[in-house]
Amino acid sequence: VLNDIISNRQAKKSVEGGVDGLIAVAAGAGGHTGNTSPFALVSEIREWWDGPLALSGCIATGQNILAALATGADFAYIGSPFIATKEANAVADYKAMIVDGSAKDIITTDAFSGVPANFLVGSVERAGLDPKSLKRDADKAIDVSETSQSFNTWKDIWGCGQGINAVKNIVPTAELVARLSREYEAARRTFLDRIG
């Protein structure tokens, strides 16, 4: 069992609870997100944890995968680029918004679930909301499930990470994986050449 965590404190609680591994959700991740730098988050966790550790957050290229490993993570956890694959069970407009988007098209808000999450601004606007005026109801309990409002947070308002600029078109999953692999190997060779 791997558990998503956004802080060192949550990581410790998860390990105390018996998880087998951790997914460090750092700044830039799609959907529910952390606000800590991946360098700081992985470093803090690696001071005491030597078990399986994935890094998530703004990972969309092979270079990003190499960087995740360089921080001390065992592997990278990638989400948003896979939404824009042919096999993904996402509506065409969601996929198109990712392909056409970049980091500037992402908003971080706790207004929908009480927990900070990254969403595509365009999907917030399509739901009839003003992204600049979103506010969390402090009296409302935190709820990460779909809402009973006129829109469903995860169905109509689309989670997405900041690394989407790397997503240029809708491709089969195998093609995305092959691209990530090629980019990783090229980045690894370049890095090894630099350090001699």
Where are these regions (language model features)?
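Hydrophobic faces of well-ordered beta-strands that scaffold small-molecule active sites
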Residues: 1-3, 22-24, 53-56, 76-78
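Conserved short-loop catalytic and cofactor-binding motifs
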Residues: 2, 29-33, 56, 82, ...
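Glycine/Thr-rich beta-alpha phosphate-binding loop at enzyme active sites
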Residues: 4-43, 85, 89-91
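Conserved active-site-proximal phosphate/metal-binding subdomains
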Residues: 16, 38-54, 60-196
